[in-house]
Amino acid sequence: MLDAMKTESVRIQQEMAKESKSSLAGYQDLIVGQAGWWLLLKYELIMLFCSIIPGALGLLLRSIFYPCLLGSCGKKVYFGANVVLRHPHKIKIGDNVIIDDNCLLDAKGRDNDGITIGSGVFLGRNSILSCKNGDIVLRDRVNIGFNSEVFSGSRVEIGSDTLVAAYCYFVGGDHAADDVEKGLTEQGSRSAGITVGANCWFGAGVIVLDGTSIGANAIIGAGAVVTKGVADYSVSIGVPARHVRDRRNGQP
């Protein structure tokens, strides 16, 4: 997965810089993720006529036409205004989902599965789900507050019934920086992924770093930075996040 992520990062820059490749072809590769004029035309028409229309009419149009771009889409899925979809054929959404205004769902990658959103999920305004040849899985009834971001270079999974407050960042990847003789952009990226158990609560402004696993029923206090594993039922706070008590008995 590390090699795949490095390859994808470098590939995007190289593809966009090719003199032999038209700007339109580069755009289609980056945004649509599939070749073919019909697929590009369909994407452009749906986004042009549906994405920024406000009010009930916009909700209706997007609920009808956005699913035509997606890998799969359940019933009663509502897309707010200016929701942006990239590589939409790799986005799968369950039933009764709300994606608020100005969200970005970016499933790009060569051989990844992309973004899977379970039923009953709420994604708050201005939030971002971003893949770089990785996968993002939001299990049923996950609630993500506004201005939050989930990034994945391998796999980030958030368990069912988890509550994520505003301005949180799940950083499912990192830059390689081992070779001081090379520029950082030449060294690519690496990712170990993030796993979050069911029924967790993340306070506002939490940052979860790559390679961490957070157990079920855990609570992470506002502003914490999670750098290592968190046990089931743990209440953790601070920078870096440290365990302060067990929810089951109140003991450290």
Go through the PLM ranges and name each one.
Residues A231-D232, I237-P240:
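Acidic, glycine-centered active-site loop in nucleotide-sugar glycosyltransferases
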Residues G203, L209, G221, V226-T227:
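Short hydrophobic beta-strand segments in globular cytosolic domains
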